[in-house]
Amino acid sequence: MTPTQAHGRLDELGILDGSHGPGCYALRVSVPSGVESVQRTWLDAIDAPLPDAYAEQLAAAETCLYVGRSGNIYDRIMDHADGQVRRASFIRAFGVTDIHGVWPDDANTGVAERNRARSLSSATTCVWSDGELF
């Protein structure tokens, strides 16, 4: 996803205005199906293996999300989309395919970020946040 696509998607979702302040956000990422493919993709980007339990959970998920937080959600999403300034390991390994949502009412805290990740995770959805898989 490019910065132009990310901007357009925020606008399509009707959350562009709300993204210009602090809060949490979720990005949809592309994760291969199959534990070996997940591990190979991770190792191609990150010079350390992914825990097997994480690889198994990611491979089995229908949807994989990355949840983050920022003092300015829009700027952080643009940084992730650009890939030159900020590139979280999970996003470096598995590319961003869509914006799942933004929550400007969430506090810009680690607790709010983890709570958002927990609320989005389910039997079919894996959520990566700050090095943890929910």
Regions found by a protein language model. Give the residues of each.
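Conserved short hydrophobic interaction patches
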Residues: 80-84, 119
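GIY-YIG nuclease catalytic motif and its immediate N-terminal context
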Residues: 1-79, 110-116
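A cross-kingdom feature marking charged/low-complexity
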Residues: 104-122
